[in-house]
From Swiss-Prot:
Keyword Oxidoreductase listed: no
Enzyme nomenclature, EC number: 3.1.-.-
Top-rank taxon, per record: Bacteria
CDD domains: YqgF (cd16964)
Function: Could be a nuclease involved in processing of the 5'-end of pre-16S rRNA.
GO BP, one annotated term: rRNA 5'-end processing
Record keywords: Cytoplasm, Hydrolase, Nuclease, Ribosome biogenesis
Main location: cytoplasm
Family named by the database record: Belongs to the YqgF nuclease family.
Protein species of origin: Mycoplasmopsis pulmonis (strain UAB CTIP)
Single GO term (MF): nuclease activity
Full protein name: Putative pre-16S rRNA nuclease
UniProt key word Transferase: no
Length: 146
């Protein structure tokens, strides 16, 4: 049986990043990993965390949430993610795919709220859940915005 190369997803913010990884057997579903908090705009910390995950898990694709406005146009956050994407490409050899993340955090919060956990736990888990939603979308559709 051939080894499955996993996928990892990131939901990047200015002070936190959610990570999710695909399952090791079939790449058919996403597993939330963690919400990683860092100093505002210190994206080198995110790169270092991704290097940690690269050692821990073998993955061949990095899925990066791409925040577009509801109209489909780019925003200030879109430009931030594009700059981070350039940093990823300089650092990693894996395929990098941008995936439209509109409403992913809203959906993640709603899903977590349904589990009756506290607001502080929702805040703690929302980004990794959003990353899992992005990754599930990619795994189910194999579509990216570029």
């Amino acid at each position: 049986m051939a080894k499955v190369m996993r996928k990892i997803a990131l939901d990047l913010g200015t002070k936190s990043c959610g990570f999710a990884i695909s399952d090791p057997i079939s790449n058919s579903f996403a597993i939330p990993l963690e919400n990683f908090f860092f100093e505002e705009n210190n994206f080198k910390k995110v790169i270092n965390k991704l290097k940690h995950y690269e050692k821990k898990y073998e993955f061949d694709t990095i899925i990066l949430g791409y925040p577009l406005r509801m109209t489909g146009t780019r925003s200030e956050r879109s430009i931030m993610v594009e700059e981070f994407e350039k940093l990823l490409r300089k650092t990693f050899s894996q395929r990098i795919v941008l995936v439209d993340e509109r409403l992913s955090t809203v959906k993640a919060k709603a899903m977590l709220k349904e589990t009756n956990i506290s607001q502080s736990k929702i805040k703690e888990k929302k980004d990794s859940m959003a990353a899992a939603l992005l990754l599930n979308y990619y795994l189910n559709n194999f579509l990216g915005v570029r």
